């Protein structure tokens, strides 16, 4: 079974528990933090994935590192240790977020801009692009990228809306290169 399919199964099981206990948002926040730590601390992954480190020691490391998370998240991590699948934690977190978003009718969006956007601008992007994405609402995160020169670039799931000056220049360059190839 592929890692993606396995991640979806664990995420679905955890999501069911979250629904029953009415902790969908809290568990999502916890998983986001856990994912960040797993990505940033490669040594943690190395220890948890090492076959010579006993499972009980791995669980103690998890308890010491993530003792403040909910029992459901901690026990999911323990289960992943028992089944030697701790490497799927970031994917599991991503799948859980997708399920939580579907449940709420929301989508995550990243708006790249040359300068930080105001709350009013972020709210405006959320309203306009929520309809475009077919969602009730968008959770917008703003990332500053001076390479855009001007305008904005918006990523919603795997869709990108590029209204940046850099994007327009790149499209003009490709168009001119295509015309030159036809002539040459």
Swiss-Prot record:
Q: Which GO terms describe its cellular component?
A: plasma membrane; proton-transporting ATP synthase complex
Gene3D superfamilies recorded: N-terminal domain of the delta subunit of the F1F0-ATP synthase (1.10.520.20)
**UniProt keyword annotations, A-Z:** ATP synthesis, Cell membrane, CF(1), Hydrogen ion transport, Ion transport, Membrane, Transport
Q: Which Pfam families match?
A: OSCP
Primary subcellular site in the record, as a coarse category: membrane
Membrane topology, record value? Peripheral membrane protein
- Entry annotated with the keyword Membrane: yes
Q: What does this protein do?
A: F(1)F(0) ATP synthase produces ATP from ADP in the presence of a proton or sodium gradient. F-type ATPases consist of two structural domains, F(1) containing the extramembraneous catalytic core and F(0) containing the membrane proton channel, linked together by a central stalk and a peripheral stalk. During catalysis, ATP synthesis in the catalytic domain of F(1) is coupled via a rotary mechanism of the central stalk subunits to proton translocation. This protein is part of the stalk that links CF(0) to CF(1). It either transmits conformational changes from CF(0) to CF(1) or is implicated in proton conduction.
**Record-given protein name:** ATP synthase subunit delta
Q: Which organism is it from?
A: Bacillus licheniformis (strain ATCC 14580 / DSM 13 / JCM 2505 / CCUG 7422 / NBRC 12200 / NCIMB 9375 / NCTC 10341 / NRRL NRS-1264 / Gibson 46)
Q: What is the lineage of its organism?
A: Bacteria, Bacillati, Bacillota, Bacilli, Bacillales
């Amino acid at each position: 079974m592929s890692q993606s399919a396995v991640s979806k199964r664990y995420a679905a099981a955890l999501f069911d528990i979250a629904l029953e206990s009415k902790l969908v948002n809290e568990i999502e926040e916890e998983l986001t933090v856990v994912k960040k730590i797993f990505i940033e601390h490669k040594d943690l992954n190395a220890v948890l994935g090492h076959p010579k480190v006993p499972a009980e020691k791995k669980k103690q490391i998890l308890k010491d590192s993530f003792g403040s998370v909910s029992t459901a998240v901690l026990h999911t991590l323990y289960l992943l240790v028992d089944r030697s699948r701790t490497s799927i934690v970031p994917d599991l977190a991503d799948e859980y977020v997708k399920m939580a978003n579907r449940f709420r009718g929301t989508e995550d969006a990243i708006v790249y801009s040359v300068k930080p956007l105001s709350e009013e601008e972020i709210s405006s992007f959320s309203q306009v692009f929520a309809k475009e994405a077919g969602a009730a609402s968008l959770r917008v995160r703003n990332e500053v990228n001076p390479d855009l020169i001007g305008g904005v670039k918006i990523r919603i799931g795997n869709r990108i809306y590029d209204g940046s000056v850099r994007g327009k220049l790149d499209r003009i360059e490709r168009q001119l290169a295509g015309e030159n190839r036809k002539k040459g």
